[in-house]
Swiss-Prot record:
Belongs to the universal ribosomal protein uL11 family. InterPro entries: Ribosomal_uL11, Ribosomal_uL11_bac-typ, Ribosomal_uL11_C, Ribosomal_uL11_C_sf, Ribosomal_uL11_CS, Ribosomal_uL11_N, Ribosomal_uL11_N_sf. The gene is rplK. It comes from Aster yellows witches'-broom phytoplasma (strain AYWB). This is Large ribosomal subunit protein uL11. Part of the ribosomal stalk of the 50S ribosomal subunit. Interacts with L10 and the large rRNA to form the base of the stalk. L10 forms an elongated spine to which L12 dimers bind in a sequential fashion forming a multimeric L10(L12)X complex.
Length: 141
């Protein structure tokens, strides 16, 4: 018989930098999870993605054990890295802060395809282009 999930915790944690301080400690403490164990496992899993914020979904079982699934970094983080900017535009419709190529959008879409609500790369590209547009990033061919 499978273990019963009693709580699901969703967090966004910098890759390789999980520690018991907020937001990780309080969120997992409420679920009565072994926090140092989670931090070491998460840091080991994400050490090759340093510099990105990694979404993680933690399933806590009734015997206080846990499993977690890491997702791909948010599209906005990937777009900022591709455009070499610190943040998006405060007024995206009027001010464009950077330009990226369609090829860069396609690379990001391929990376994010498993987490997006799309079945093909073309549709995933449209989703990424929409995110870029909302950040004030212009997509050129």
């Amino acid at each position: 018989m499978a273990k019963k999930v009693v709580k699901t915790v969703k967090l966004q944690i910098p890759a390789g930098k999980a520690n018991p301080a907020p937001p990780v400690g309080p969120a997992l403490g409420q679920a009565q999870v072994n926090i140092p164990s989670f931090c070491s496992q998460f840091n080991e899993t994400t050490k090759d993605q340093m510099g990105f914020v990694i979404p993680v979904i933690i399933s806590v079982y009734e015997d206080r054990t846990f499993t977690f699934v890491t997702k791909t970094p948010p599209a906005s983080d990937l777009l900022k890295k591709a455009a070499k900017i610190e943040s998006g535009s405060a007024n995206a419709s009027q001010t464009k802060v950077a330009t990226i190529t369609h090829k860069q959008v396609e690379e990001i879409a391929n990376l994010k395809l498993s987490d997006l609500n799309a079945y093909c790369v073309e549709k995933a590209c449209k989703i990424i282009e929409g995110t870029a547009r909302n950040m004030g990033i212009l997509v050129k061919d």
